[in-house]
Regions:
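Enriched for short, Lys/Arg-rich terminal
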Residues: 1-25, 40, 56, 64-85
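A short, surface-exposed loop/turn module that caps and links secondary-structure elements
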Residues: 29-54
Length: 85
């Protein structure tokens, strides 16, 4: 399987600043794994949108996949209680 390239939406950098450092390391590791498998076990396609989400502790990572370009765009990172608002 080909490796996907990871890109971040500009607003994700603001989301990252809100995440505690201990959780941030785990989130970054989880995002890096998306390059090898953008649809890992436990990922879920969001209803009505071309977005996927993966869980990392109490945080959710929302992203889109472009299979033709082999890219993954991280759209949003946030706490599970706030991410879908």
């Amino acid at each position: 399987m080909a490796e996907y390239e990871i890109f971040f939406k500009e607003s994700v950098w603001k989301d990252i600043k809100k995440v505690p450092k201990g959780d941030l390391k785990k989130i970054i590791a989880r995002i890096e794994k998306l390059a090898d498998d953008p649809r890992p076990l436990g990922s879920e396609k969001l209803t009505g949108e071309e977005l996927y989400r993966v869980r990392q502790g109490n945080y959710r990572i929302l992203y889109s996949i472009q299979d033709k370009e082999l890219t993954v765009w991280v759209i949003k990172i946030g706490n599970r209680k706030d991410i879908y608002r």
